Amino acid sequence: MTERAGLRLHDTAAGAVRDFVPLREGHVSIYLCGATVQGLPHIGHVRSGVAFDILRRWLMARGFDVAFIRNVTDIDDKILNKAAAAERPWWEWAATYERAFTAAYDALDVLPPSAEPRATGHVTQMVELIERLIERGHAYAGGGDVYFDVLSYPDYGQLSGHKVDDVHQGEGVATGKRDQRDFTLWKGAKPGEPSWPTPWGRGRPGWHLECSAMARTYLGAQFDIHCGGMDLIFPHHENEIAQSRAAGDGFARYWLHNGWVTMGGEKMSKSLGNVLAIPTMLQRVRPAELRYYLGSAHYRSMLEFSDIALQDAVNAYVGVEEFLHRVRSRAGVVVVGDWTPRFAAALDDDLSVPIALAEIHHTRAEGNRALDAGDHDAALQSASSIRAMMGILGCDPLDERWESRDETSAALAAVDVLVQAELENRQKAREERNWALADEIRNRLKNAGIEVTDTADGPQWLLGGDGK
């Protein structure tokens, strides 16, 4: 079933749900702000990936060719500070946690992006964008930095609703700024930090500049949808719009923002110390169950984490899984069929996943009744529809990828028990100042392909390479 009609999406810029009409018929271009790879991914990070993976899967199922770009911010103040505190090269720190994010996305079967550009690989395009802004009178150099002149762009604030007079960029006081409402495009070089040559001296890119340059490189001067967390609306996305459109680009036509994962009403974040890392969560539930949970709320809603809510999601997923296994054992092979009209109507209405899930569970109830009555044909039809609908949500229990992931998750849980024991021995050796033994344990883990990183939250481990 691949008709292309009726999709409506909530556009943050319009403040309303709009009919989705792509720039090119049959093609959709999407840019998702990806991770700043400073530490282990937690469920707040990955919720965005799951939410917009559902959008991508639905568009593809509707017959669209989707170009999906998700960037990696691999140069940033937080990365530099954390790497310096750990006495490790910044690029090694970024690469380590980029692998951790990739592993998290893979574990939850988030489809790989069409391209995944790193900020450090696109400095040339960033410099070219700054040059265009300076030529057009929207940017200026000062004190070794380059800034965007906010007052030069009359439409500033339209996405977020901020009035120019009330703007605070959160960058602190900078001597080179003409106006403290201006934001940094390029940061002048500092001792010990990475830098690149430019017409304004050596330095590194500002955060907002990176996404504008990478989106243009891969999707062109104008594209369909820009996605990200609602915390990025201001200043990040507001500044992206300003610098891109001031440079003459149309930029994104629709803006979609997902809600936070909260705990006790507070946004999940490392600074608050209330994060739940993906590796930790996958010791508690299976990958498919975690994906089901993260995708179960409407993408624009806050997702309040609790053990009860997580278990409710697990129970709901297991109910679907058990029904499909029951049908398969009694009626034979369950193929992927067609979704129901009510499921399609739900996703066409701004990706209303809770309503779509209600339709899945309604179909499951019908299928169970048919199976109990001995009507295997009707039960198979229900099961086939459920496979199609759960597949759109990325968690079809009968997909062979999930069965292999369940086995991998169990294996990783066993490995974690062994690694944690080694890390406890290493910590004891360090407390006793037995540095030789501590190094021996770390090297033993490294030779087994396990990378250990000492963080403020204690040692963290990742499967690295082949141990060579």
UniProtKB/Swiss-Prot annotation:
Q: Enumerate the residues binding Zn(2+).
A: 33, 211, 236, 240
Look up the EC number in the record and give it: 6.1.1.16
Q: Which GO terms describe its molecular function?
A: ATP binding; cysteine-tRNA ligase activity; zinc ion binding
- Give the InterPro entries listed for this entry: Cys-tRNA-ligase, Cys-tRNA-synt_Ia_DALR, Cys-tRNA/MSH_ligase, Rossmann-like_a/b/a_fold, tRNA-synt_1_cat_dom, tRNAsynth_Ia_anticodon-bd
Names of required cofactors = Zn(2+)
On cofactor binding, the record's note says: Binds 1 zinc ion per subunit.
Alphabetical keyword list: Aminoacyl-tRNA synthetase, ATP-binding, Cytoplasm, Ligase, Metal-binding, Nucleotide-binding, Protein biosynthesis, Zinc
Compartments reported by the entry? Cytoplasm
- What GO cellular-component annotations does this UniProt entry give? cytosol
| Annotated S-S bridges | none
Q: Which SMART domains match?
A: DALR_2 (SM00840)
Q: Per the Swiss-Prot or TrEMBL record, what residue ranges does the short sequence motif 'KMSKS' region cover?
A: 267-271
Q: Which NCBIfam families does this UniProt record tie to the protein?
A: cysS (TIGR00435)
The cross-references to HAMAP family, in alphabetical order and at most eight, read:
Cys_tRNA_synth
Which family is this sequence assigned to?
Belongs to the class-I aminoacyl-tRNA synthetase family.
Protein name per Swiss-Prot or TrEMBL: Cysteine--tRNA ligase
